[in-house]
Every structure is written in structure tokens, then in C-alpha cells.
Amino acid sequence: MGYAGLKQLIEQNAWREAGRELGQYMNGEWDDELAVLAATVFSALGDWEGAYTCIAQGLQYNYKNYELYLLLGNYYERKNCNQAWLCYENALYYCSDEDDRRIIQQHKERVQQDDRWCVHKVSIVILTYNLKDMNMQCIGSIRDTCAPSSYELVVVDNASTDGTLEWLQEQKDMTLVSNQENKGFPAGCNQGIKAAEPENDILLLNNDTIVLPNSIFWLRMGLYEEERIGATGSMSNSVINGQRIEAKLAGVEEYITYGTAMNIPMENALEKKTWLVGFAMLLKRKALDEVGLLDERFSPGQNEDVDLCIRLNLGWQMRLCHNSFIVHYGHGNGRNSYIWEQTFSVTSEKFREKWGFDMSYYTYSRKELIAMISEPKESRIRVLEVGCGCGATLAHIAYEWPEAKVSGIEIQDDIAKIGANYLDIRQGNIETMQIPYEKDTFDYIILADVLEHLHDPERILQKLLSYLKADDSILCSVPNILNRHVISDLLRGKLEYQDAGILDRTHLRFFTMDSIVRVFERCGMEVTQMMATYDTEELDAEAEELMNALYQIPHIADRQLFQVYQYVFRAKREREAE
């Protein structure tokens, strides 16, 4: 497609005329050439957000277009010299025209004169243990997608026996540490970090990954978004902690296509996180130097990434980069699922011994409650969560509703301190504290598995109602004491409290669907929306027989109610309920 008239106006610096000329193309078919021209015009007219939109659209068509990264650098120069420099570095990587390379280099050098400029090269630390083909694919993907000047490879081999070590020894572009025994993940990573250039940022990367175009570029852009960001992490197809994409695709090739299309400029790309999974975690060198290396008590591996992030939370913040996708097979380093589960159990206990709490208990994002928020994503909602843990649910709300203002109350002091590092979280006991907010403030108050811990749930509901706007909602979840596992045990004379679950030893109150509805009714509220989650664990044969007999008793509760694990619901004041 030709744009001769538009190009001529740009060459003449006739920007207003160019803007009018551009109008005839805006609703037609786009390509990356038009995106370059449009972004150039918008930039010249001072419409930087319009320029950004055009750049993002152009990179959808051609992620290798160096002119778009040059324009993206111009966009960031106004606000962040480090991110601008990274864009110019990426433009150089994709540019083969020598004249244009000189221009881009001049941009880089100019930005480097800024006193605030401080960008470090990345040392990519990879551990290998057999799986030769996978190792070759991982390392090859880095070579194929990253500017050679932007990184160094540091590979730690944990005594491979399948030819991996011999192949690594033939490579000329990496630092190799060769162990005579398998030292595990934390110790191996520490060896790699120590072998890296001392000023470099560190990317811990699993060997069962495929790096896609711009995966690491956007991790670095996220890391330098703010000075206090100490670590960034990627999205993937196989990962926990809210880092897995929702799309279910057929295989690796489809994920490569999907991920490549994701790795472009994105509005609201960064989500605040309490911790990041270590399969692909980029660490700012200054932050790592402050908090120290991975804790080798977690060898052979699992939970060392959570531990590192807890230490980072004492002064640094973490971000999940939604526009950085890395394919993850999820079974590298020679682990199988049984060994993984056994190791995770052992290292989780070590984590509890070190920190005094179970991290998974306090960092779970309650997406089923978030799904009950009905306001448009551009709304300026106010949300309070009581019993917010480290703030995972609040952080995800703040990501999904960028204009939202979220606040939390957490009873555990050490947990509240972690969350307060990146969100408005206050420590306090909701049953005794003065709530530090104005009345009639919140659109939503969240009580996720809280009421069962209270001495007087109805008094607290009445207390919280005054902080809720007149026509807005409480979002709540409670475990179901009528669950078949609990009832079958009771009928056999058993009642054993647990560390977590329906019979959590800290529970003071128990609810059925009917009883929790009545609690809210007595507080002048009506449950307007309810859903249930069901347990999938099979009963033993004796319990199954007992429950089947119970179901036959006249006037017994509906059979389905015994299968419910938890109720999740939304409630409003009765006078405002529709």
C-alpha cells in the first residue's frame, strides 16, 4: 500500500496537514508502515498516547520493525530514560540499515548522558541436568530472539550424563560451570549468579522454556518501570501464581504463535505481585545484592523463589509482565510429578519453620469473588478487603480495574507488613480496631473466609455496613459445614481439626447455606448472587455407604448440598436490593 501524499507532508514537516491526510487511512486496513507514519505524525502533534497506540498496533503486524522501537524510545524519553534506552537497543537489534543504525546509536548515546540513566546487561542463568534436546532448544531460543550485546549466558550443569555437558563444552558464547554432582536448584543458581558479571541483572530461567521474540525485552522494560521494582516475571502456559494464561491451545507451536503476538506494547501491562515463580524471574542486581542469594536450605528446589521474594518485599516490589510470554514445558531439570510433590511438601515445611507462616495461605487470589464485581473496568471503584493476607486479591483487582483504589486489613502483623510494601494494607483485628476509613466509602467490602474466624460475625457485619456505600455490596465466602466428608466423619464419631479447610483449627463459627443467608438477613441484607464450589475428593467405601443411607431419610437436606465445599456470594442492603 502506498502513502505517497502522507510521506510528502511528513518530509515537509506539515504536521497538521499530515494529520488531516492520515484521517483517510485510520479506519481502513493497517500495516506496520502506516503505523510508523501515523505514530510519527501523532508524536509531532504532541499526541503521545495516540502515537503509543499506533506503535502497538504496528508491532502486531511486524514485531521486527525497528522504526517502531525507535518511535517507542521517543515516547519513553519523555518519562523514563532507562526504558527509552532499552527501546533504542531493541531498534538496533532489528535494524540492518547502516545509516539508520548510526541515528539509533546517537539516540542511545544521548540518553546515556542523563544522570538518571542506569541500565545493566542481563546474565541469563540456566541450570541443566540431562534433557539435551530441551537445553539446546532453550539456549537456541535466546540466541534467536535477543540482542547479543544485551545479555550473557551462564549455564550450570548439574552432572548431566546424556551428552548435555559435552554439547555445552563446545559452545563459545557462554560461561559454563560444571558440577560433579547434582547440587539442586538453589545452590546451582547461586553458582551461576556468582559466575556472572558482577554488575549484571540476573534472569533465572528454567531449561524447559522457549524464549520468544521480545520476552526478555519486556521483562527488562518492566524492571526499569520504577526504581523500587526489584523483580519481574513472565506469563506462560504452565505456571502457578496467576501467571498462566487462560487460553488452552493445542501444542507448543500454537503457544509460540500466541506468545509472540502477546509480546508487544500493552496498556496496563504490569501487575503488582507478592511473589513471582522462578521459572523466568528477572532480578535487579542492586536488589539481589541487598537481600542476598537463594536460600540453599530449600535444596533440591521449590519455595526458594517464594523465600527470595519475601526478602525482596522488605524494600522492593515485584511486577508480573502480562506482555512477556515464555513457553514452559513444566518438567525440566529431570523432575517428575511425584518427586516434585514430595519435594514441595518438604520445602513448604522448611518455609514455615523459617518464616512462621504458610505462604500459599496468604497469597491466594480469590478470582471467584473478583468475578462478582460488575462495574466496567474503567470504573473508579473503592474496595476494602478484611483478612486480605498479603494482598493478592486486592492487587489483581487493581490490575483489572486500573482506576480502582484498594485497601486491606490483615490481623497478622508480619503478613500485613509484606502487603503494605506495595498496597494500602493496615494491620488490625477487625473485631477490636477502629476502622481507619471514612464512612460510606466503599463500593465493595470483601470477606473471603473471614466470618468463620469471628466471635460475633453479625456485629462485625453491622459495623462494616456503615463503611459501605448505600447501594453497594459485600462479597463473601464461607466453608460449608454440611459437606459430606465432615458429616460422614461425624456420623462415625470423628471430629479432627486441621491446619486448613472446613475444620480449620482457627474456625470459631460454622455455616450451612441456610444459616449464612439468615445471618445476612438479620443484618438487614439480602443475598443477591450465590455460587458454590464442590469438593472432588472421593469418599471411602464406608463413608459412601453411610451417606447413601443418609440421603434416604425423609426431610433430609438436598443431596447436592452435602457436596458443596464452599459458598461464594454477594449481598446488598435489603432496601437497595433489586
Which residues does each PLM region occupy?
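N-proximal low-complexity "stem/linker" segments adjacent to membrane-targeting elements
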Residues: 89, 93-141
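A conserved acidic beta->alpha catalytic loop
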Residues: 157-166, 181, 388
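Conserved donor NDP-sugar-binding/catalytic core segment of glycosyltransferases
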Residues: 210-249, 480
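S-adenosyl-L-methionine-dependent methyltransferase catalytic module, highlighting the catalytic core
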Residues: 243-244, 267, 296, 455-577
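A recurrent flexible, glycine/aromatic-enriched loop bordering the glycosyltransferase active site
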Residues: 252, 260-286, 501
